[in-house]
Amino acid sequence: MAQCNLFYQYPITPILEGHVRNILICTEEDIRRLQSQSSLRLREKIDQGHRDKLLRMRLKTELDALQRKMQKDSDVLNSHLKAIEDALLFTNDGEVNVETKADTQLLPKSPERLEKFNQVAITPLDPFIRFTDDFRGEMINTFFNNAQMWNFTFGSWFYKLKRVFYNEPGLRRALKITNVDSLTISKELLTVTVNALEQATVYPIFGSEMSDLEAALCILAAFYSTYENSQIDERTTLVDIITLLPVIFRLLGSEITALKNVSPSGTYFGFNDPSCMKFFVPMRKGKHYAENTFGNHVLVKMLLGRGVMQKIPGEKDSQNFDVEARLHGAIKNDVLVYWTYQLMRPKLGNNVPIFIHDQHYLRSGLVAIESLFLLWRILNSESLFNKRVGKFLLTSIFPQLENVDFAENNFEAGNIQNFEYLMHHYVVPMYNLQNDISISTLFPGLVAVCVNESVRLGWEHKCAGAPSDAVQVQSKENPFVEYIRAQMEQQADVAILEKHDCILFHFENGLNITLSFTLPRQRLFAMASSLFNVNDTYDFIYFLVLGFLPIPAII
């Protein structure tokens, strides 16, 4: 049997014997351990599910709150945009219909709706423009908000300013000047430049009780009252004088023509300032200019001839006149004092200045008269209904407007009233909104053209007495560059004031040069066309009011 053992015995001795039921033997301890581990894993899964649920609920709550906040902010933004659109665009009876992008109905015209806003109109071809407080600033903001997809040029003058400031790193960053080769300019540069134009006739330091516009209206009212058929009395207001400006300027033009016939050299609109005069404020006690400053001014001669003024400011006898005027008012004998008191008493009470004594009011008033008289001579020289050659369209600022061409070929106008319309629908509302508004704030474009005309001829105070046939080179750069640089660099107040007054003196001289021409329109249009994109009367009117004229450019 020993030989058969291999057939019934295992060749290897088993270490672990198999269970009777062929299953593994597991102790109670192992089973409890496995159950505990399973319970822990299950508990972790349940807790993780609760945490995920809480996080999802919290995320949903935050998303709902964010959605509500975004909806609220969106509603506020939409209401602001709607208010801006309503403030800037509306139509009234007899004007061009304006449609918005969101609604095809005409904008409301109820007085309750309109009284919340201020409104002006520039030309009879366009609808009224509504604004809140700052007309020109809101126009600039509206233009740049709507001009994202286009490139616009503002003329070579603005482009030269951009190139000058581009070479100065500090000003380049502050004015956000990037691409010097592009004809367009930044919003910051345009805003700073237009602000400098607006401040030309606003004296920043010397406290004035009345603006140059108010002083001019007082002088014109006194002049007009010397005619028998004048339409003014004690109830007349400054607004009434503004509406009467066309009538007054026709009389004024006749007087100037009469003086010119007597003396061809008698149409001088300048002032005889001493050489190297730097500041506009009178240096003699802060009230009087040098003797003979007003002696050759044609408007002063005319006022003396009409009996509006008793003495030429600066004469020796005028000192006694000043004392008498201060003590007794001189209401009976002095027409200018009387009408200044009548027109300014509602605003100033009894503290009404006398122009012969406070001569800066007389000088600023004469400059304002020159400005308005020049506009009267230019704006009514061509009808807006003629075939246009200019490229400016109001849709450049307001894309919602519909381009309507009112021009006619070979149109012959019988009664052009561009100046009258501008006075009634622009100057009067602006004066009612801000009764200390000045000429440069009303017409910054006029300041730009006249100052550049004076700078182009190289005029300076020290050259004021040079012969008329002498040619003066330009020894200084653009005065606006120096003024803007002084403001941006926060230089001393005296330095800023000197550069401001340099612009003011150039403006006075530019008016004198332009008014001395028989046809000043051609002179101004030539300057405005080469520097500011002006090509016709429509362009010129908008440039006068805005101080800039955006024209689409293909770059």
Swiss-Prot record:
Region span, Interaction with major capsid protein/MCP: 1-47
GO BP annotations listed: symbiont entry into host cell; viral genome packaging; viral penetration into host nucleus
Protein localization: Virion; Host nucleus
Annotated GO CC locations: host cell; host cell nucleus; viral capsid
Pfam families (UniProt xref): Herpes_UL25 (PF01499)
Chief location bin: virion
Protein name: Capsid vertex component 2
Organism of origin: Human herpesvirus 6B (strain Z29)
